[in-house]
Each structure stands twice: as structure tokens, then as C-alpha cells.
Regions:
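Short beta->alpha hinge that forms the Motif I/post-I loop of the SAM-binding pocket
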Residues: 35, 70, 95
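Rossmann-like NAD(P)(H) cofactor-binding subdomain of soluble oxidoreductases
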Residues: 78-131
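NAD(P)+-binding Rossmann beta1-loop-alpha1 motif at the extreme N-terminus of oxidoreductases
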Residues: 1-65
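Phosphate-coordination loops involved in phosphoryl transfer and adenosine-cofactor binding
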Residues: 1-3, 89, 140
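Rossmann-like NAD(P)-binding element
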Residues: 56-91
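Internal alpha-helical scaffold of NAD(P)-dependent oxidoreductase catalytic cores
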Residues: 137-222
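Residues at the starts of beta-strands that form the adenosine-phosphate
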Residues: 3, 27-29, 115, 142, ...
Length: 223
């Protein structure tokens, strides 16, 4: 039985749990951790995890694979806190949208014996939280994988197979290439969307302008 740990039980972490449990329920045991106890409780109730761990050390105890599904800013603290509690053969991966900095943190904080594979599923919603998590979120999407130094073929194959079980298509990239490509197709559109809405909302005529906004404006500013 594969033992999976999911740290962070929002949209992405919850959807990973739901997708894996749906695809491999009989051969998988999922432990989850969320700083918000209500999110952890709902993840259990929704079937995204089998058990909610009370803390980070408990979350990774005995894990074969640990997914870190938090904002990048939270990762240094998480990596420091789990480093001494990881099983020797545990593979650690993440879901952050940038990889160069994350790979640097992993090398800095994780034991040399730990295999870290950067991950980034190209999927999401404009809403967040465990309540909007869904098993089909990753179906048909590209799942970027960035092997770390010394990543074994077996570890990369394990994470690739889990991504495929979620319905995604694994794509192996180098960290720098990932960040440059994603900046153009994900980060830039988000920036443009935010800038457009902020500019329009700041106009004195926004109350009237908003009544004229139709599907085109909604589509562009959805992000």
C-alpha cells in the first residue's frame, strides 16, 4: 500500500486527495494536514484524506510520498519542520507555480538522502478552499515535474504515476525552463487580468461602467 501525505488541504491539496482516492482507493492511504482544523475535518468528511494529522511530523510519519500544497511563502517553514521526520525513502514534491526558488529551498532544508521532485499541476479555479476541491480538477491537464539533483528513475516514475492516476499528463522540465514558460502562459495573464480590473474599478464612472460589463470583461478579469 502506498502511503501519501498531503500538507495543505485547500483546492489543490484537497483535489489531489480526492483524485487519488477515487483512482486508487484500495491501494492508497492518505494522511492530510492543514493549519485550519476545519479544513482538515472537511477533507476527512469529503473523503480527500483517510486521517487528519495533528501536526507536520505526524503528517509525514511513514509516508512514501509527501505533497506540499501550500503557497510558496509557507514552504521554507514546512521544509524545516518536516526535514528530521521524513522516512529515509520518502519522496517529497510540491505544487507551487514557481520552481527555481522552491528547488533551492528543498536543497537547503531537506536531508541529502531525501528525493525532492518539484511539481506544478496546470489547473485551478478562481475560488479556493477544500469545499471547491474536486476529483476531476486535473483531468486532461499538464502536470509539470522538475527532478532534483540525484533524483532516481524510480522516484520520478512514482510521482509520474500518481499524476497520471489523477488524470493528468506528466511533463518533465528543468526549473528555469518551467518558470520562464509558466510566466508567459499563467503569471502574465493573471497580472493583466488584475491590472485591468483594478484600472476599471478605480474609475469614477465604475458604478455605471460595471453595469455595462458583459461576458468579455468577466472572462478577462476572472483570474
Amino acid at each position: 500500500m502506498t502511503r501519501v501525505s498531503i500538507i495543505g488541504l485547500g483546492l489543490i491539496g484537497g483535489s489531489i486527495g480526492l483524485a487519488l482516492k477515487q483512482a486508487k482507493s484500495s491501494s492508497l492511504r492518505v494522511t492530510g494536514f492543514a493549519r485550519n482544523p476545519n479544513a482538515a475535518r472537511r477533507a476527512c468528511e469529503r473523503g480527500a484524506v483517510d486521517i487528519a494529522a495533528p501536526d507536520l511530523p505526524s503528517a509525514v510519519a511513514g509516508a512514501d510520498v509527501a505533497f506540499i500544497c501550500t503557497p510558496p511563502s509557507a514552504m521554507p517553514d514546512i521544509l524545516r519542520n518536516i526535514a528530521s521526520h521524513l522516512p529515509p525513502k520518502c519522496v517529497v514534491t510540491d505544487t507551487a507555480s514557481t520552481k527555481v526558488q522552491v528547488m533551492t529551498w528543498a536543497k537547503q532544508w531537506l536531508p541529502a538522502t531525501t528525493q525532492f521532485i518539484g511539481g506544478h499541476p496546470m489547473a485551478g479555479k478562481e475560488t479556493t478552499g477544500i469545499e471547491v476541491a474536486e476529483a476531476g480538477l486535473f483531468r486532461g491537464c499538464t502536470y509539470c515535474l522538475v527532478p532534483g539533483e540525484g533524483t532516481s528513475e524510480a522516484s520520478l516514475r512514482l510521482v509520474s504515476e500518481l499524476a497520471e492516476a489523477m488524470g493528468a499528463r506528466p511533463l518533465v522540465l528543468e526549473a528555469q525552463a518551467h518558470d520562464e514558460l509558466v510566466a508567459g502562459v499563467s503569471h502574465l495573464p493573471t497580472l493583466v487580468s488584475t491590472a485591468l480590473f483594478a484600472t476599471a474599478e478605480g474609475k469614477d464612472a465604475w458604478p455605471l461602467m460595471s453595469q455595462l460589463a458583459a461576458s468579455g470583461f468577466r472572462d478577462v478579469t476572472r483570474l
